[in-house]
């Protein structure tokens, strides 16, 4: 059961077999899980790239992944401040990382999401950016994303195992030389696609991504696209969702500017409360901050329980 709950809702079986309930009496609870880690990482990067100061409410900043992301974004030039009310204020770089000519190294330890997102974001640097991590991260393949960045004009170098961190990304000297079309013959991680999608609005010509193989964890790509749309980016997708077109700096209103945003509670964590209520007749578990417009695929979990 626990392993099932860790999967995106779209991968859940049509009918769930629930074990006997540990609680025999009905209950009625209202819960608010911590902010979504997936949304936090996406919003941190977008706010750091935007122009002006964004206000983020409810981010999961205590998680090690988020701390690594924030530290790396500071190195790249973004500024972070904790407001008295608990909001996180992020002053972005308007799509231009402040990297010295000699480059920088970002040690992301074991933060996989930050590793993938910042590898793609290195396209927006004026100098080399080396993505590194701990021993375990140095064994995790990132070559598929490296190949995509190479096809867009970046020079990619690996200092250790082929296709694994440490990976140095050297963007083209001329930002206008960055390509605007990339194909993924296979998709080892949906985060590779999300990483490029998050960066695309700041590319001069935007980006078209063609997904040719099986797509893993597609609900997280949908999350990224909907988040961009909520911030005013005119993303277009084909009917089969295999082609994703994201406009660049010179199109429409341009990339996102400073924004105010509330991070949704983590829907994956909420599934435990919903499942517990489903096992006890007459019980009710309500999750504040999650509704029908949630960006998270796991927010559909109650609908699966009702089938």
Predicted regions and their residues:
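Structural preference for solvent-exposed beta-strand-turn elements
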Residues: 1-307
